[in-house]
Amino acid sequence: MFDTTLLILLGLAALGFISHNTTVAISILVLIIVRVTPLNTFFPWIEKQGLTVGIIILTIGVMAPIASGTLPPSTLIHSFMNWKSLLAIAVGVFVSWLGGRGVSLMGTQPHLVAGLLVGTVLGVALFRGVPVGPLIAAGIISLFIGKS
């Protein structure tokens, strides 16, 4: 039987390879493997917990320089004494807030997820973005449609 979903995933993986974005390509190939093997029984868990696991892994990656000591405490302290660093802190707070609104919106408005995913994959593949886009994009959408 013809599997349209598999064809779409293969197309998106190809787009990831063509654009030299291995993050997208590998992610989609992993999902294809899960789809075509008995691992597909894990999709409900992946759909429910995947975003949380991804955020945890992303946070570990961001916090690793602090934990390893390559970002010394003095640098952290100085970040409160420079206007550019203070601006970076403010932007970080704002974007985190947007991401939080985005997670809520994606949970309550699942029909928006498809558009967010397509937009994110295109942004990652064509414009060298990173796949944190759906959360922030959903947060921005929540500002326009008034949902939190």
Curated annotation (Swiss-Prot):
Organism of origin: Klebsiella pneumoniae (strain 342)
Transmembrane segments: 14-34, 51-71, 86-106, 121-141
InterPro entries assigned: UPF0756_TM (IPR007382)
Record bears the keyword Transmembrane helix: yes
Disulfide bonding pattern of the chain: none
Keywords: Cell membrane, Membrane, Transmembrane, Transmembrane helix
Official protein name in the record: UPF0756 membrane protein KPK_3307
Compartments in which it is found: Cell membrane
Family statement: Belongs to the UPF0756 family.
PANTHER family: UPF0756 MEMBRANE PROTEIN YEAL
Domain of life: Bacteria
Membrane topology: Multi-pass membrane protein
GO cellular component: plasma membrane
